[in-house]
């Protein structure tokens, strides 16, 4: 008599997916709500905007610094194990943020929170395919994309409501029980794993140089840095030294060989470009809607949430579409919609009112939902199982580098175009001008991503045709 196969019951899969879903939602929630926390922090701590900006930048630096390490350690030590540790660190850091007595304490806690978030994002993306059959991989990516968008959508609205009623500490306290719930679901139902076959220690020199390069990059992009051009020079030098050290390492920190596939390389670069646009949109929206139309912050938060909410509703249909027509057509469709939306925002007329801003934003986020689901499915889904964590780490790294560039670089450009060190003092016309010019630049970035998607696909088709010719000759 044959031995029956042991299959996990549906409830186990549901709890496991719930844990991965919360591990995807919470980092996005922690990131998006900070935009509305900044004004309250400025009033309580009495610090300038340049210091407040580091509440955002520190979180992104924490995420970005650990994305590749999380993927490597996940492949080597076990993805479930590292996901549990990362979620625990995120919960602890959320409590430390709420207890922060100074802006320096808060920035340090946000860095730690970002480190935990990196493990959550990378490992949830890498493990999603393990809980569903290959035919439903697009569905699982759509689920994570939906929850990611939900986190981005809930951040501004919940942040605004909680800050108004209970102070800026309340949003951080809300993250604590949710993180503990994610930890419980993952602990109970995610499949246990063994350490990977990879051996050898972590290249600490490469890691230190990478963190130094990222820190200098963040300082260089922060407007008003007293160090002048030195952070930019430091970032360049540290990156050159990192490439030299890492290329000579026995087990390099960045698995750059994984970028050899044309489609994967194009998807990772496009992810960075799109992420820079989306985070800049979240940063610009509150200042434009509040300053140009005198809307209260509660209304502003609800309006900003509508775009990510639409993306959340589009995530599952996007996954369904990917499963049926393939990832590449959906990537092109999503980027095309985003280009149209960015052009409309670049031509924005303030006489159209808040609705004139909101409608293109809705189109932009719908396109983003299509792009993210299809791109994640193509980049991570096509990787081999042993390297899926590393590929997910590269994808998350590119996205967070884009977010860092958008928050510091495009945000600084927007402030410079407004012509005021303090954006609260900018006039409605100055804010409208800064918004139009910034979105004109984002349209160019999105056009570059669309061109890149087409170029990489043609390269893949050329490789396939060349392989076919060589097979025919043999």
Task: Name what the model sees in each region.
Residues 13-36, 49, 124, 165-174, ...:
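12-transmembrane solute porter fold
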Residues 67-69, 75-205, 351, 411:
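Helix-loop-helix hairpins in multi-pass membrane proteins, especially solute transporters
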Residues 164-270, 277:
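Hydrophobic transmembrane-helix bundles of small-molecule transporters
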Residues 89-99, 116, 178-185, 237-241, ...:
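Transmembrane-helix signature of multi-pass solute transporters
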Residues 1-12, 454-474:
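Intrinsic disorder in cytosolic terminal tails and internal cytosolic loops
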Residues 39-42, 128-133, 138, 142, ...:
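Helix-terminus/helix-capping segments at the ends of transmembrane helices and short amphipathic helices
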Residues 24-28, 56-59, 63, 90, ...:
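Structural signature of transmembrane alpha-helices in multi-pass secondary transporters
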Residues 37-65, 105-107, 293, 298-302:
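Extracellular/periplasmic helix-loop-helix junction of adjacent transmembrane segments
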């Amino acid at each position: 008599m044959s031995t029956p196969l042991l299959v996990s019951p549906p409830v186990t899969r549901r709890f496991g997916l719930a844990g991965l879903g919360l591990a995807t939602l919470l980092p996005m929630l922690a990131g998006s709500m900070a935009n509305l926390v900044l004004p309250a922090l400025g009033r309580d701590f009495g610090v300038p905007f340049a210091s407040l900006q580091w509440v955002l930048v520190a979180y992104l630096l924490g995420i970005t610094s650990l994305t590749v390490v999380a993927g490597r350690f996940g492949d080597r030590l076990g993805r479930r194990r590292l996901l549990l540790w990362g979620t625990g660190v995120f919960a602890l850091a959320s409590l430390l943020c709420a207890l922060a007595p100074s802006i320096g304490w808060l920035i340090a806690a946000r860095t730690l929170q970002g480190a935990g978030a990196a493990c959550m994002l990378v490992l949830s993306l890498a493990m999603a395919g393990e809980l569903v059959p290959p035919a439903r991989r697009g569905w699982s990516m759509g689920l994570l994309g939906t929850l990611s968008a939900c986190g981005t959508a809930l951040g501004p609205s919940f942040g605004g409501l909680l800050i108004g009623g209970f102070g800026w500490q309340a949003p951080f306290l809300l993250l604590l029980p949710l993180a503990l719930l994610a930890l419980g679901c993952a602990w109970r139902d995610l499949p246990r794993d063994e350490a990977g076959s990879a051996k050898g220690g972590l290249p600490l020199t490469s890691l230190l140089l990478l963190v130094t390069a990222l820190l200098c990059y963040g300082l260089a992009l922060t407007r008003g840095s007293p160090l002048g051009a030195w952070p930019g020079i430091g970032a360049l030098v540290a990156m050159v030294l990192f490439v030299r050290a890492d290329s000579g390492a026995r087990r390099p920190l960045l698995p750059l060989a994984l970028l050899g596939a044309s489609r994967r390389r194009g998807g990772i670069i496009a992810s960075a470009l799109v992420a820079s646009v989306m985070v800049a949109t979240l940063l610009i929206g509150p200042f434009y809607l509040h300053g140009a139309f005198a809307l209260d912050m509660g209304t502003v938060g609800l309006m900003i949430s509508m775009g990510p909410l639409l993306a959340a509703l589009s995530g599952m249909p996007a996954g369904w579409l990917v499963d049926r027509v393939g990832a590449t057509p959906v990537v092109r469709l999503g980027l095309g919609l985003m280009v149209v939306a960015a052009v409309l925002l670049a031509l924005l007329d303030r006489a159209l009112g808040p609705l004139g801003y909101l409608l293109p934003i809705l189109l932009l986020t719908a396109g983003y939902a299509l792009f993210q689901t299809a791109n994640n499915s193509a980049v991570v889904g096509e990787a081999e199982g042993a390297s899926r964590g590393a590929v997910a780490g590269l994808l998350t790294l590119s996205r967070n580098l884009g977010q860092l560039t958008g928050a510091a670089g495009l945000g600084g450009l927007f402030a410079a175009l407004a012509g005021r060190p303090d954006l609260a003092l900018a006039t409605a016309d100055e804010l409208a001008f800064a918004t139009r010019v910034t979105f004109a630049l984002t349209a160019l970035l999105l056009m570059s991503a669309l061109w890149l998607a087409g170029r990489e696909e043609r390269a893949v088709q050329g490789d396939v045709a060349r392989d076919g010719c060589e097979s025919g000759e043999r």
